[in-house]
Amino acid sequence: MALSKEDILTWLEEAKTSEVVELITAIEEKFGVTAAAVAVAAGSGPASVDAEEQTEFDVMLMSFGDSKINVIKEVRAVTGLGLGEAKALVEAAPKAIKEGVSKADAEDIKKKLEAVGAKVEIK
């Protein structure tokens, strides 16, 4: 009697972990393969690109809160913009303050802006 792929998958869903481990060990011995090599090969396709951790972040000023002047000063310090440009950026919230920065830099900028009363999100 031949088992169908569906029968095998059903058994795997219902089997105990120890039974699955025994099956994997038997397959490794019988066919001279290792499960680690199969796992690496399965994860090396285009689907693994989606699983990668995000490396670039955008710092978004959602609102300037009660202390607009202090937020403008901090935006100037973080971005290097002039007074008028920083003021326009703050007044245009929600707006990106910095784009494509590392996670550490984004967290640092967020902390500085929140310290002066701004509402900030990292995307």
Swiss-Prot record:
Pfam families noted in UniProt: Ribosomal_L12, Ribosomal_L12_N
Subunit structure: Homodimer. Part of the ribosomal stalk of the 50S ribosomal subunit. Forms a multimeric L10(L12)X complex, where L10 forms an elongated spine to which 2 to 4 L12 dimers bind in a sequential fashion. Binds GTP-bound translation factors.
Sorted UniProt keywords: Ribonucleoprotein, Ribosomal protein
CDD domains: Ribosomal_L7_L12 (cd00387)
GO terms, biological process: translation
Taxonomic classification: Bacteria, Pseudomonadati, Spirochaetota, Spirochaetia, Spirochaetales
CC annotations in GO: cytosolic large ribosomal subunit
Gene this chain is encoded by: rplL
Function: Forms part of the ribosomal stalk which helps the ribosome interact with GTP-bound translation factors. Is thus essential for accurate translation.
GO molecular function: mRNA binding; structural constituent of ribosome
Domain of life assignment: Bacteria
Official protein name in the record: Large ribosomal subunit protein bL12
Stated family: Belongs to the bacterial ribosomal protein bL12 family.
